[in-house]
Amino acid sequence: MRRDARPFFIRRLRDGFEEWRVRHFLEPQFDSVGPGLKVAYVSGVELWGANIHAGHDLHLRAARGNMIRLATWDSGGRVGEIRIGDCVLISPGNQIISSEKITIGSNTMIASGCYISDSDWHDTYDRTAEHDKHAPVVLEENVWLGTRVIVCKGVTIGENSIIGAGSVVASDIPANVIAVGSPARVIRPLDPAQEIRKRSDMLADRDGLQREMQQLNRYLLRENTLFTWLRSLIAPTRKD
């Protein structure tokens, strides 16, 4: 489809149903999660294991065929842990898998297809066991990972830093820099004279933002009718 052909009231009903699914099926899978959890495509989010925690206003934007997976594993007496701060955005196709501990700071944005793990999962020579091939991962506040970034065990990425698309982060990245490559290297610092606005600034008035989005959707869908929506499902045209 080229556009959303649903009338506004159908969109509202669908959104309400998805919010119910989040409360009824997804929230109980977290050990703790703050208010304001928003999920696009609930069926595309998978939580596995214990010790998964998130702050307020976590946004999970899964998509059909592009699941988000948050998983912790029991590695023989040591259970992994995932701690996600406030106002974090996780995009489609992300896998965050912990054997020890992964910490994601508030306001962090993770683009599509990233992989974050605190373990190699198998020893170099004894490939039947993990042994000591694990170390905590920390993404400090307001980190931005580009598309298909891989973050390896033992890495800390400093506050505000940006990792370019396709990079492999195998060692620590300092705060307030841009890093790219495989392995990721710092290419330049951020400009200290520039103000950095964060997701928490946008979400400070959560209810007001929600009202604005509803008004925008009402405007964008204003010409859609139940008949034209049903027709677009049964007999779509080039305009649909």
Q: In which residue ranges do the predicted regions lie?
A:
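Glycine-rich NAD(P)-binding loop of Rossmann-like domains
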Residues: 77, 129-142
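Short-chain dehydrogenase/reductase
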Residues: 162, 178-180
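A short, glycine- and basic residue-enriched loop/turn
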Residues: 136-137, 154-155, 176
